[in-house]
Amino acid sequence: METNRKPLTTAKIKSMKKEGIPITMITAYDYPSAMLAEEAGVDMILVGDSLGNVVLGYDSTLPVTVDDMIYHTKAVTRAVKSAFVVTDMPFMTYHGSLDQTLYHARRIMREGLGKAVKLEGGAEIAPAVKALTQAGVPVVGHLGLTPQSVHQIGGYRVQGKNSDQARELLKDALAIQEAGAFCLVLELVTDELAAWITDQLSIPTIGIGAGPSCDGQVLVFHDAVGYESKPWPKKFVKTYVHAGELIRDGITQFVNEVRNRQFPAGEHTFKMDQEAVDRLYGNKGN
């Protein structure tokens, strides 16, 4: 557990690439998960639109709204003192006019109190990235598997398996960097491509299912701690604890103890003194 850390900045995050210090990022969606991430010493916390899947019960990220992202970012930022908080901009909030993009980002930053926003996409969203950075909004890019485009790309598939696709992704990465992004997430891309992009960029890359060559790594909180009792196996995920099983077992024990009248026991119960009891019910001797 790390204490008394200075708040991270975009400049510090970029310098970590130059210094060869791996960057750690994890998602968080509420006060308790953000507090645990902060106490663990995570560098960056992503309030991801993955909350649609793991918190709100949707089958994709597409239904998540700006109001959802603000609500959860506010909870996260209340817990964080030093980690750098990034908020996803939801589906179709940065694909219209630049004025609309700035409006949505302004709401997320002002109301959610995060420090940056994350956008999915390549060269086609470079104008949005440029408009945001020129307005003073730090931007994290996201390439490879982009969940908001999952239907367009044909499902959750590894990207960059052939040379043509790899070259296009590098072009996209350079375009996002040129537009002003200070960091880039690479999701589900081949190890070789991630290494190539990381070498070609001056900004840090953070991988999820992108091999060990990225400048940092990110995992979804629920995957990392095994929060789901029956998690969907993913090759690129490492589960460090199985919190879901412990939580389920604890709740099961609670249910059993209540039904068997074992809880609450004496140590969980508050008592009146005898004089107060006598006054409440009446003293039979009077």
Q: What kind of feature is each model-predicted range?
A:
Residues E2-Q274, D278-N286:
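Alpha/beta enzyme core
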